[in-house]
Amino acid sequence: MVPVSLGCAMQSPWQLVSGGVTSPQGFQASGIAAGLKPSGKLDMALLLAPEQAVCAGSFTTSVVRAACVDLCAERLAANGGQARAVLINSGQANACTGDRGLIDSQRATQALADQLGLDAEALLICSTGVIGVPIPMPKLLAGLDPLVAALSATGGEAAATAILTTDLVSKQVALEAELGGRRVRIGGIAKGSGMIHPDMATMLGFFSCDAGLDPSIWKAMVGQAVQRSFNAITVDGDTSTNDTVLAFAAGDPLDSVHHAALEQGLTEAMQHLAKAIARDGEGATCLIEVQVEGALDEPSAQRVARTIVGSSLVKTAVHGRDPNWGRIVAAAGRSGVPFDPEQVALWIGPHQLMQSGQPLSFDPEAASRVLRSETVQIRIQLGDGPGNGLAWGCDLSDQYVRINADYTT
């Protein structure tokens, strides 16, 4: 598990525990090497939810979408927000593959349904890898039997590894809280390293929860949590064809008085993995966290934060350990969010660099040392409005260029 702080503003009842996506009661997962990757690494994963599970999804905003994305969205809509499992293959995006892409996704879920004894319409599929490359179906189909056989309540780690592409590390999380006199758990796994940008980009995230909820309530919770996590990260500003978040919930009903706490836990879990993705950005040496305060509203604050953390000039300044506050303010100014420049205050770590829109005297060497941290915190105050927002990214290094010059997307 990547050690990323949850960074919650309010007191949280949620605590980190072990177990990842199979930590919640009743969930099983597996990950195997089916030969989809030339490297021989794990490349196929399965997450199975208990009966009566509800599921909510969030999908890429790109108009160029893999067939599996549309299949997931259509099945969730047709089933009223219910699903039992998701199959994930790594190595081939199965995007821009014509009619074959949809046919292969349907064949894969039907074959898996036969293995599990379930209706194919209750199964989802996600693919990640090289765009334009179809799934090698004979290998995938041959891998279903051992994949199902490997399902277990301890299979979350194997699943977390099997979904990776250019990631340096696997990413998983599990949280636990006492709600209504009983233990509730939330688990998750994710992948993503490059082509990460707000509005869900080249990343996959899968979550589980052992509380029973109405599908519409769960869908609203997932939407809010995604907006404050995966839609608040950027590595390189590129958006993908396959990015998907799927969140399953199944268990004893949870009283509505605890729904806010559950949404808080789901947000914390997603933020944990979102920051892990940003920290694992291709060629990255640090995580950048931008906090915006005093905006007109939360969406405005988030937009400014995302613009700053996505600025190539800001990212390269951080990599060069250069406390160049002008790049930060300039990025905020082009965000499209109205604010009064004469009210701006700016901090890098504990060092205040601006007040009332004017530069302050500061120790550049001390500020530069802050930029050498594993997590670089930038805070900007736009005014006295109620809107606050967070976004995460990473620095931009020459290693990023080398990685993407050598790897076919």
Curated annotation (Swiss-Prot):
GO terms for molecular function: glutamate N-acetyltransferase activity; L-glutamate N-acetyltransferase activity. Substrate binds at T165, K191, T202, E282, N404, T409. GO terms for biological process: L-arginine biosynthetic process; ornithine biosynthetic process. The record marks T128, G129 as: Involved in the stabilization of negative charge on the oxyanion by the formation of the oxyanion hole. Gene3D superfamilies: ArgJ beta chain, C-terminal domain (3.10.20.340), L-amino peptidase D-ALA esterase/amidase (3.60.70.12). Transmembrane segments: none annotated. Its EC number is 2.3.1.35, 2.3.1.1. Keywords: Acyltransferase, Amino-acid biosynthesis, Arginine biosynthesis, Autocatalytic cleavage, Cytoplasm, Multifunctional enzyme, Transferase. GO terms for cellular component: cytoplasm. It catalyses: N(2)-acetyl-L-ornithine + L-glutamate = N-acetyl-L-glutamate + L-ornithine; L-glutamate + acetyl-CoA = N-acetyl-L-glutamate + CoA + H(+). Disulfide bonds: none annotated. The record marks A201, T202 as: Cleavage. Pathway: Amino-acid biosynthesis; L-arginine biosynthesis; L-ornithine and N-acetyl-L-glutamate from L-glutamate and N(2)-acetyl-L-ornithine (cyclic): step 1/1; Amino-acid biosynthesis; L-arginine biosynthesis; N(2)-acetyl-L-ornithine from L-glutamate: step 1/4. HAMAP family: ArgJ. Catalyzes two activities which are involved in the cyclic version of arginine biosynthesis: the synthesis of N-acetylglutamate from glutamate and acetyl-CoA as the acetyl donor, and of ornithine by transacetylation between N(2)-acetylornithine and glutamate. NCBIfam families: ArgJ, PRK05388.1. Heterotetramer of two alpha and two beta chains. This is Arginine biosynthesis bifunctional protein ArgJ. It comes from Parasynechococcus marenigrum (strain WH8102).
